[in-house]
């Protein structure tokens, strides 16, 4: 590229000088430099070195009205040779190419990072749409530790504390404790430990699963305008939407937790055989049926409006409801709220 530019500037490649001519030029260089850098002073062949400064720098240089030394300034009216114009065009093209390469590198790095950004966005959206999905895997060793702590000291290591320490939902803690309790009972019946090869394999390869990280419930709020008549003297401030969403999520999470515990207790009694759910268990006993009677209140209302329930025995006597019957009544009580379900399902 440099040789091409020199060719364009000079029009041709310089020929190598002969040896004799080169020696003559070399002998004349000191005299030529002396002649350019000095001028005769007193006529006796002396050199006046101080006058050499006037040959290169003038008053305009110090006043700032002239260009600096060594920087050629092209006048607008001065014609430019085709060779110089071609070299300038090539410099501009090189600068454009370098800028394009730099932009291409930045664009490639930005596009390559989109894969990680999309994965992070999908994880966040999945967490919002399906609460608790980030805690899809919990090691079996952690489950064993959770059950051991609760069994040794249930007063200290409650369900709430275990859920906080292991960063999982309270419903999951209940399920894990019941699962480990059933496994321990099964090992006691068999007289040997259960096969845990699958759990060991999963614990040894945790990179194939998403580690748990703070499960929680996120409420699904309707996206519609909410118009309210504000009182007189309202300053125009409103509550933070995130704070409102957090409070609603906590209320719904508490309701879901209570319903889960209720269903879990019923399933435990069902597994233990205390709940009769097949058709042969519904035959009439020899001494007769036991009925649940609900007495109306003062204003002829049922349930929480003033009525109370009791059991009527076949012999005509009555008694209060036991724990099993209270559980049945609570399961049959309708829930006066909207159905809580995960969004986008």
Swiss-Prot record:
Question: Where is the protein situated, by its record's location annotation?
Answer: Mitochondrion
State the superkingdom.
Eukaryota
GO annotation, biological process:
cell communication; embryo development ending in seed dormancy; endosperm cellularization; endosperm development; gametophyte development; mitochondrial membrane organization; nucleus localization; pollen development
Keywords, A to Z, come to: Developmental protein, Mitochondrion, Transit peptide
Start and end of the transit peptide? 1-43
Q: Which GO terms describe its cellular component?
A: mitochondrion
Q: Where is this region: Disordered?
A: 36-82
Function of the molecule: Essential for fertility (male and female gametophyte functions and development). Required for the integrity of female gametic mitochondria. Involved in embryo apical-basal patterning, and particularly dorsal-ventral patterning, during early embryogenesis, and endosperm free nucleus positioning and development as well as early endosperm development, probably by modulating the expression pattern of related genes (e.g. AL1, MYB3/AL2, CYP78A13/GE, PNH1, HAZ1, MPK6 and OSH1).
**What is this protein's record name?**
Protein GAMETE CELL DEFECTIVE 1, mitochondrial
- Which species expresses this protein natively? Oryza sativa subsp. indica
Instruction: Identify the gene encoding this protein.
Output: GCD1
């Amino acid at each position: 590229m440099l040789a091409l530019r020199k060719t364009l500037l000079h029009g041709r490649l310089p020929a190598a000088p002969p040896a004799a001519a080169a020696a003559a030029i070399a002998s004349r260089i000191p005299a030529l430099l002396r002649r350019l850098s000095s001028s005769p002073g007193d006529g006796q062949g002396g050199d006046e070195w101080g006058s050499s400064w006037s040959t290169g720098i003038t008053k305009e240089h110090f006043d700032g009205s002239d260009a600096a030394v060594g920087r050629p300034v092209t006048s607008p009216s001065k014609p430019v040779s085709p060779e110089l114009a071609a070299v300038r065009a090539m410099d501009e093209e090189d600068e454009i190419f370098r800028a394009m390469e730099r932009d291409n590198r930045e664009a490639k790095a930005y596009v390559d990072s989109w894969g990680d950004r999309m994965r992070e966005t999908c994880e966040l959206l999945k967490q919002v749409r399906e609460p608790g999905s980030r805690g899809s895997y919990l090691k079996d060793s952690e489950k064993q530790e959770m059950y051991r702590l609760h069994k040794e000291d249930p007063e200290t290591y409650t369900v709430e504390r275990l859920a906080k320490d292991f960063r999982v939902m309270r419903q999951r803690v209940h399920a894990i404790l019941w699962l480990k309790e059933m496994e321990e009972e099964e090992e006691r019946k068999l007289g040997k430990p259960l096969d845990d090869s699958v759990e060991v394999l999963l614990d040894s390869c945790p990179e194939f699963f998403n580690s748990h990280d703070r499960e929680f419930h996120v409420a699904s709020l309707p996206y519609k305008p909410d118009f309210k008549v504000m009182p007189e003297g309202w300053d125009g401030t409103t509550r933070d939407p995130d704070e409102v969403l957090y409070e609603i999520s906590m209320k719904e999470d508490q309701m879901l937790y209570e319903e889960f515990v209720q269903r879990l207790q019923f399933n435990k009694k069902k597994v233990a055989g205390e709940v009769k759910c097949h058709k042969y268990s519904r035959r009439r006993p020899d001494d007769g049926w036991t009925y649940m009677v609900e007495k109306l209140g003062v204003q002829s209302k049922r349930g929480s409006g003033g009525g109370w329930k009791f059991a009527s025995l076949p012999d005509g006597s009555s008694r209060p409801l036991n724990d099993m019957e209270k559980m049945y009544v609570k399961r049959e009580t309708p829930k006066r709220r909207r159905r809580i379900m995960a969004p986008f399902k």
